[in-house]
C-alpha cells in the first residue's frame, strides 16, 4: 500500500476520512505522539527547531534593515527626527488609483509607502547607525547569521553531531551556559557596543571598524579601571542642553547614574543604559559560575532543592523530587519558560513607554501606542501558552509516587481551596466594579452626576508619593519638598529621577484619580478570572470529582462517550480555550485604558479622561466612538486619505472576528449534515462530479472547530483594535 500522509503516524494515515488531514496538521508538532519516537529523537528535534526559529528571526530582522535601507528615509529622518515620518517600505499595488497614490506618497518618498510604527528608526539611531550603508551592512550580517543558524539546525540532526539525552539533561551546565555564555557575555558585549559606538555617536563621533581602535571612548582609556578610580568614568556627563548626535553640550562620562531623561530626546541617558548593561553582565557572569559542573565546584541544584523542607512540616517533603520531575519533563520546562517570558514581555510593554530607552521615541506617539499594545497582546498569548503546557505536564509526565507529599502534590491536594479563593476574588471584583460603573451610569442618565460614587486611589497615590511624586501633598520623605531625603536624593542619588517623576512631559507615575481606580479593578477582575480558568484547568487536568479518570483521555477530548453526562467541555484544553477569550478581554481593557489616558495626556485635555472614565457610557462614547468615527467614515466613493487602509482593516477585522462565532456556536452535527448535503449535490452535478476525493468528507471535531473559531475571534479582535489604535493616534498626531 502506498505511504499516505502524515508519515509520522500511520494510525492517522489509515483513516479513510478527511480527519486524516486535520488530525495530521494538529499533531505535526506533537513529537511525543509520533510513531517510532525515542527520547533522544524528541530532544534532538526540538533542539534543531530552535535553530530554525533563530534563522527565521534573523531573516525577518535582516528584511527590516534591508527594506528601510532600500525604500525608507532613514538618512532624512536622522537629520530631523521630529518632523520626518519614518518609512517602513514602499507599496506596489495595482489597485491604487491616483487619489490613493497621492494619499500614500509621504515622508519625502517618490511613490506610495507605509509608515513605520515599530520604533526601529529610533532604535537604530540610538545604537549608532546613521547611514543606509550601515543598514545594508547590518542586513547582510543578519542574513549570514540566519544561514549559520539553519546550518547548525541541520548539522545537529546528523548522526555524528546529534547531542545525547544526557547532554540535554545536564541542567547545571545548561544553566551556566545560558547565564554566563548567553546573558552575561551578550550583556557585556552590548555594554561594550554602547560605550565604543553608540555613546560616541550620540556626541557626534562616527565610530566604525576603520577607526574603532583610534577613538578612545573615554579620554583616559583604561587608566581609571586599572588604577581603581572607577568613579572617573561617571564624571563630566553630557549637559542638559546637549543636542543628541552633536558635540554641543556633550560630556566625556561613559558610565553614569544620572536618572531621568535626556531633555531633548526624552529617552534614558545612554551612559545610564551602558552602566546598567555592565552591571547586568557582571551579575550574570557571576551567576553562571554558581552551579557544579566539570570540576565539582559550586552548587548542586538538586541538593539545594531537596534541602528546602520547611521545619514546621506544613509543606510536607518540601521540594523533594522536583529536580527530576522538572528535568525529565519538557512540558514543565516549557511552561516555566513561557510563564517567565510572558511576564518579561508585559514588563517590556510597561517600561518601553514609561522609561523609553530610544532617542525621540517618546515623541512618536503612534509608535508608543503600537509597541505597548503589541507587547501586551504577545505577553497574553505567551502566558496562556504556559498554562497549556502545565496541564500537559500533569497528564503526560507527572509521577505521583516521585512527588508524594512535596509542594507540587500539595498544590493538587489543596486545589479546591485555591480554585474557590480565586473564584471568590473574581466574583467580588466583578460585582463591585460593575456595580460602581453601572451606578455612575444611572446617575449620569438621571441628570445627577454629583451622586456618582468616586473613590480616590489613596493607597496607589501614597505609593507614587513614596517614590517622589509631590502632586498629592503626602508628607513622606521623597515627596516632602522640605525633607532631607528629597534634597539628598537630588544631590546624590539619581539627580534627574525625581525631576522626571514630577514633570508632565513623560509617562512616569501618571496622576491618577477615580477613573483609574475603577479601570484598575476592572483589569484586576479580568486577570483574576483568566487566572482562575487557567489554574483550574491545570489543577483538574488529571481528574476531578466529576471525572476522576480524566488523565486517561489526554489533554483534549470533546466528550468521553455515552453514559457519562456532563463531561463535555471539561478537558484541560477547554480551559485554555476559554481562558484565551478572557485574556483578550482583559488586554482589551488594559490597552483601552493606556490609550485613552495617553491620548488625553498628549493632547493636553486630561480632564476628558478624568470626567468620562468613571461610567461605561463615557468609555463607549468618548473613547471608542469618538476615536473610531474617522474610521467609520473612512471609506467613501469620493474621499481617499492615508487612513483609508486602516478604515478597511477596521471593517475587515470586524468581519473576521464575527466569522469566529459561526464556528463557536454551531457544532459538529450541523456541519456534518451540511457537508453531506454538499457532497450529495456535488456527486450529482455534471462537470463538478468529474472531481472526486479519496477521503470521505467529515466535519471537524468539536475541539478543532472551537480552535478555528478561537483563531478567527483572536485575529479579528486584534486586527480591529490595531487599525483603530494606529489610525486614531496617527490621525491626531501625524
UniProtKB/Swiss-Prot annotation:
Chlorophyll a B1 binds at residue 654. GO terms for cellular component: chloroplast thylakoid membrane; photosystem I. Gene3D superfamilies: Photosystem I PsaA/PsaB. It is found in: Plastid, Chloroplast thylakoid membrane. Phylloquinone binds at residue 671. The chain crosses the membrane at residues 46-69, 135-158, 175-199, 273-291, 330-353, 369-395, 417-439, 517-535, 575-596, 643-665, 707-727. Keywords: 4Fe-4S, Chlorophyll, Chloroplast, Chromophore, Electron transport, Iron, Iron-sulfur, Magnesium, Membrane, Metal-binding, Oxidoreductase, Photosynthesis, Photosystem I, Plastid, Thylakoid, Transmembrane, Transmembrane helix, Transport. Pfam families: PsaA_PsaB. It catalyses: reduced [plastocyanin] + hnu + oxidized [2Fe-2S]-[ferredoxin] = oxidized [plastocyanin] + reduced [2Fe-2S]-[ferredoxin]. Its EC number is 1.97.1.12. GO terms for molecular function: 4 iron, 4 sulfur cluster binding; chlorophyll binding; electron transfer activity; magnesium ion binding; oxidoreductase activity. Its main location: plastid. PANTHER family: OUTER MEMBRANE PROTEIN, OMPA-RELATED (PTHR30128), PHOTOSYSTEM I P700 CHLOROPHYLL A APOPROTEIN A1-RELATED (PTHR30128:SF19). Belongs to the PsaA/PsaB family. The PsaA/B heterodimer binds the P700 chlorophyll special pair and subsequent electron acceptors. PSI consists of a core antenna complex that captures photons, and an electron transfer chain that converts photonic excitation into a charge separation. The eukaryotic PSI reaction center is composed of at least 11 subunits. This is Photosystem I P700 chlorophyll a apoprotein A2. The lineage of its organism: Eukaryota, Viridiplantae, Streptophyta, Embryophyta, Tracheophyta. The gene is psaB.
